[in-house]
């Protein structure tokens, strides 16, 4: 565990709360200035020297506040470059996993691409972006590498899995924020002479919402612990799939509890739920991770699965 996590989360919580609702051109410069991009870079290389649990804590806060700025992508990019011994260029560095779009690609000064055991760093002038938007209205651009890589190195990191973990971490915060909004609404909204929260059907729905949010929290924590241990492919596959299930169940509940107000652009809920629905598909959707997890489980067999689960849990918690 990082000794500076309390300081880190206090700083992130205050900054992200101040930036909630602010556009990219306001939010990103402040996020960059705070130095979050070097969260995983060792201290002797000029970074924070944090671990994946630190990353989880920060990404969770970003999701909680619906931060309109890339955070996971530059953190992962700087970590990969530091591990490869490649100097990171100035500005926003995003990532390109195989077959995936590039978050905030049009604003990036460089893109880190990992495929076939090779990491490549491309400057923006070697990239062509086909601009598009995510369901939350954020840049989600297709990239073509039309120029030569500025640097490259061998790399066996599963970039798609790291991106998937990042989305689970952010979703854990967004689900908490959506749950809080829903709780506040049903406690204050009066219908038929009493608060909505007094109705049994509402209570049951909110209990289910709470269960889904807790499941994503636990999945994200397991991923971070496994990443710090060094082997997280199983946990990430399970967590990304579980996140998809949670979004499928929790988002409709959040909107049912609010009624029409939840869909208005001025209200905070849709800024959370649109992100959640987009993150469900980014860095591999439900079908992709279900297949990857299923193949892994089938290969282990019944008794083998139990032994594997027990061993992984012992390594992470022990």
Where in the sequence are the language-model features?
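FAD-binding core of flavoproteins
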Residues: 66-75, 79-180, 184, 307-318
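Alpha-helical interface subdomain recognition
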Residues: 1-65, 165-318
């Amino acid at each position: 565990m990082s000794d500076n996590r309390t300081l880190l989360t206090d700083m992130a919580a205050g900054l992200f709360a101040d930036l909630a609702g602010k556009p990219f051109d306001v939010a990103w410069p402040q996020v960059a200035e705070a130095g979050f991009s070097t969260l995983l870079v060792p201290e002797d290389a000029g970074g924070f020297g944090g671990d994946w649990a630190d990353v989880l804590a920060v990404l969770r806060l970003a999701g909680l506040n619906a931060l309109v700025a890339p955070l996971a992508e530059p953190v992962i990019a700087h970590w990969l470059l530091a591990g490869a011994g490649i100097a990171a260029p100035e500005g926003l560095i995003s990532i390109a996993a195989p077959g995936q779009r590039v978050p905030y690609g049009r604003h990036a000064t460089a893109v880190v691409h990992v495929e076939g055991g090779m990491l490549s760093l491309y400057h923006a002038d070697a990239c062509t972006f086909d601009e598009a938007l995510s369901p939350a209205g954020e840049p989600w651009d297709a990239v073509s590498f039309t120029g030569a890589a500025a640097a490259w190195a061998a790399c066996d990191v599963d970039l798609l899995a790291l991106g998937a973990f990042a989305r689970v971490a952010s979703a854990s915060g967004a689900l908490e924020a959506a749950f809080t909004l829903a709780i506040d609404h049903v406690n204050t909204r009066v219908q038929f002479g009493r608060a909505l929260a007094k109705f049994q059907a509402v209570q049951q729905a909110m209990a289910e919402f709470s269960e889904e949010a807790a499941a994503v929290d636990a999945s994200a924590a397991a991923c971070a612990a496994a990443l710090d241990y060094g082997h997280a492919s199983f946990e990430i596959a399970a967590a990304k799939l579980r996140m998809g299930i949670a979004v499928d169940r929790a988002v409709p509940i959040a909107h049912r509890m609010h009624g029409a107000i939840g869909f208005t652009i001025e209200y905070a809920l849709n800024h959370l739920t649109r992100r959640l629905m987009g993150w469900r598909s980014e860095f591999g959707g439900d079908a992709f991770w279900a297949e990857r997890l299923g193949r892994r489980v089938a290969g282990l067999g019944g008794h083998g699965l139990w032994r594997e689960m027990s061993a992984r849990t012992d390594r992470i918690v022990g």
